[in-house]
C-alpha cells in the first residue's frame, strides 16, 4: 500500500493510511510512514468498538458508535478508492456499515489462488448467507455487497468470484519493478535495527499465531515452534512472525535475530545483503511470493505438531 501510494500522486496531498492501534508499536510505525511524505496515517482504536449492533437502522447506529468510540469518521466523498486488507476486522465492518464500496486487497501473496478457500465456501454455505447478501449483517473475504471488487495476483486464474468482481494487482510484478529509491523508502519504514552483513547458511522461521485462532495454547505453540526450529534450523536463526502474533520470540529464541512483526515478509526479498539457506513456515501462504531463500519448507499444522 505504501508503494501503491508512492506511485499514485495525489493532488490533495499524501494518501490516507488507516492503522489499527492493535498493530505493534503503532505510533512509531505511523511516524516512520508519515516521514516518507507519501502517506498520512490515522490510528483507529478498534478495541473500543462495542460489538455488533442489531435492530432497526443497525448499520447507521453501528457506524456512529464506531466513529464515537474508535476516533475516526470516513468521508467517503473525499476518496476515489478505499482499500482494505482484512474486511473481517472492526474497520472492515465499519466500511460495510458505511456502504463504502471498498476494494479488498489480497492479504498474502496469491491467497485468492490457493486450493483451500474454506472460509469463503463455509460462509456461502451458511443458512443466513442470502440474508447477509441483502445487507442484514456482515459478510467477509470479498462477499459483502459493499465490496466493490477483489484484488488478486492473477484475476484470470481466480475462481472464487465472477470476473467483473475481480481485478489483477500483481505483487510479484510490483516487487520486480521497484526502483532503488522505492526500496530505500521501504527499508526506512520497516528495518528499525541493524542487521548482520553476512549470515551464511541462515534459516528464516516464519511463525503465526495459532493461539489467536483458538487452535492451541501458548505453551503448546511455543513447544511446537521450538521443535520446528530444532528440526529445520541450520546456521543463524532469523524470525519474522505475523503482525497479530503476540509471542515473545526473543525470549523463546534468545540467540535469534527477531525482525519487526509489522514488516511485510516480501520486503525480505530485497532488503538484506544475503539470502537465507532455508525458510520454514507452518500452514501459511507467506512463502508463495518469497524469493530470498534457497529452500522453502511449508509444514501443515499436523506435521509441525508431530515434531513435539
Regions found by a protein language model. Give the residues of each.
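Catalytic phosphate/metal-binding cores of nucleic-acid and nucleotide-processing enzymes, i.e., regions
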Residues: 5-9, 260-265
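Short, hydrophobic beta-strand segments that form beta-sheet elements in well-ordered domains
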Residues: 15-20, 80-86, 102-104, 140, ...
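Catalytic donor nucleotide-activated moiety binding site of glycosyltransferases and closely related
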Residues: 45, 233-262
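A nucleotide-sugar donor-handling region in carbohydrate enzymes
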Residues: 119-201
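Conserved catalytic-core segment of nucleotide-activated headgroup transferases in glycan assembly
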Residues: 185-194, 199-241, 245
